[in-house]
Amino acid sequence: MNKTIKVIYLLMMLLIVNTCVAFAQSEEKNTQTYNWQAFDIGPAEDYNYAFDANSIKYARNEDGSINKNIIIYQEKKTNNVPMSTEFNYYSITKCQLNIEQTAICFGDESFYTKKDKFRWTDTPMYLTWITVSRDSIGGLRFIQIVEYARAHDDILTSRA
C-alpha cells in the first residue's frame, strides 16, 4: 500500500510539472514588430494571407553579392472559418521566392494564438523549391511579392 501511494504521488507531481511547463510556454508573446501587407487573392477563400513589409529583402550569394533573383520574406496565414479548429490560430512562415524559376520555398512555420501567444513551430523535413502556377493562390502571392520588390528595390537592397 505504501508503494502505491508513492507511485500515485510521483505521477501527480509529474502531471503538475508538465502542466506548468505547458502554460509557461504558451505565455511567450510574439514581440517582433510586423508591417503586414495583405495579399489580394480574390473572394471565397478560407484563408487570409499577408507578407511582412519589414522583413522582405533580397538574398546574398556565397561571395556576399546581392542576389535579386531570390526574395526572402515572412508570410502570415489566418483562417477565416469560425467553425474551424484553426480559427483561433495564425501562422508565420519564412519563405523564399526564386523569380527566375517561378518557385517558392517554405521554411519554418510558427503558430500563434489570436492574442499573439506563441504555440509551436513546424520545421520542414527538407527544403525544396515548388514551382507555382500563375492561376493559383500561390501564383497570385508570388506576383504581388515580385511587384512589391520591384517597386521598393532600394529598400530590399539595403536590407540584404
Give names to the regions the model predicted:
Residues F23-A160:
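N-terminal secretory-pathway/extracellular module detecting exported/lumenal segments
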Residues M1-Y9:
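Bacterial N-terminal signal peptides that target proteins for export
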Residues Y9-T19:
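Bacterial N-terminal signal peptides
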